[in-house]
């Protein structure tokens, strides 16, 4: 998918430029064929994979997800879903690098509990610091706290990914004001991660000025995942164009579209 506009700045992650600003996950689909078709329909170029839950080569006797999303076609973004402390998360990233032949790009997420799946920001900061020291390019799932987002960027994370709502909730953009503060201060790309439920949510995230959006459940749990994937592709482009175009100001009173001056009485 091409850039939204010829005047747009490129979307760059770890030195590589991408045409699509939609990143997608691979979980919760009914089978690998549906996974493949939905990802193709989304136009995504970066696909995230839960290393602890998905076979990407560590189990030779099981179906390998990389047969469906080949690394020569997609940028594989291994993530640490299912990790609840920094030690686990760092170990998982090191395993991913080994399985993917030295691949340094990772998505860090350290969860606080199974009920909310909120990020444990204390453990996230610890893990991020170690991973950056180890030479990883870290994209990091975090809360919508602007201070934590700033600290993660200062540590050396290449992108911060604040939640818009709880993972898998479909609640949409719950706190656009915090996201705006993060975006105003950002010195690295900001991507919404978690909470998107439908195409309008993705468009809103992009209209706020986010560089991109990552989603999984919104597509995989739709009645028609392949169709929703295509809807999300268009929503991302529409939202980015709207952001670049600039929204009209809100007004308390009406303003006629057609002037009355010069009309025949």
Curated annotation (Swiss-Prot):
InterPro entries: Aldolase_TIM, Thiazole_synthase_ThiG, ThiG. GO terms for biological process: thiamine biosynthetic process; thiamine diphosphate biosynthetic process. Pathway: Cofactor biosynthesis; thiamine diphosphate biosynthesis. Its EC number is 2.8.1.10. It is found in: Cytoplasm. GO terms for molecular function: thiazole synthase activity. The active site is at residue 107. The keyword Transferase applies. 1-deoxy-D-xylulose 5-phosphate binds at residues 168, 194-195, 216-217. Catalyzes the rearrangement of 1-deoxy-D-xylulose 5-phosphate (DXP) to produce the thiazole phosphate moiety of thiamine. Sulfur is provided by the thiocarboxylate moiety of the carrier protein ThiS. In vitro, sulfur can be provided by H(2)S. Belongs to the ThiG family. This is Thiazole synthase. It comes from Pseudomonas aeruginosa (strain ATCC 15692 / DSM 22644 / CIP 104116 / JCM 14847 / LMG 12228 / 1C / PRS 101 / PAO1).
């Amino acid at each position: 998918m091409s850039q939204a506009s010829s005047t747009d700045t490129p979307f760059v992650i770890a030195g590589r430029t991408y045409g699509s600003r939609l990143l997608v996950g691979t979980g919760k689909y009914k089978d690998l064929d549906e996974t493949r078709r939905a990802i193709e329909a989304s136009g995504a170029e970066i696909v995230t994979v839960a290393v602890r839950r998905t076979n990407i080569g560590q189990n030779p006797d099981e179906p390998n997800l990389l047969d469906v999303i080949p690394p020569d076609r997609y940028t594989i973004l291994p993530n640490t879903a299912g990790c609840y402390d920094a030690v686990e998360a760092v170990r998982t990233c090191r395993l991913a690098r080994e399985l993917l032949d030295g691949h340094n790009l990772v998505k860090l997420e350290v969860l606080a509990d199974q009920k909310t799946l909120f990020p444990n920001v204390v453990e996230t900061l610890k893990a991020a610091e170690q991973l950056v020291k180890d030479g990883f390019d870290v994209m990091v799932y975090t809360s919508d706290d602007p201070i934590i987002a700033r600290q993660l960027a200062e540590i050396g994370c290449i992108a911060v990914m604040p939640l818009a709502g709880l993972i898998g909730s479909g609640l949409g953009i719950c706190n656009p004001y915090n996201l705006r503060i993060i975006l105003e201060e950002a010195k690295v790309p900001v991507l919404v991660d978690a909470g998107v439920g439908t195409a309008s949510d993705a468009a809103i995230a992009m209209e706020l000025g986010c560089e991109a959006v990552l989603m999984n459940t919104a597509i995989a749990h739709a009645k028609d995942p392949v169709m929703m994937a295509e809807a999300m592709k268009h929503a991302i482009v529409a939202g980015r164009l709207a952001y670049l175009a600039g929204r009209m100001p809100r007004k308390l009173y009406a303003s006629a579209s057609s002037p009355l001056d010069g009309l025949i009485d």
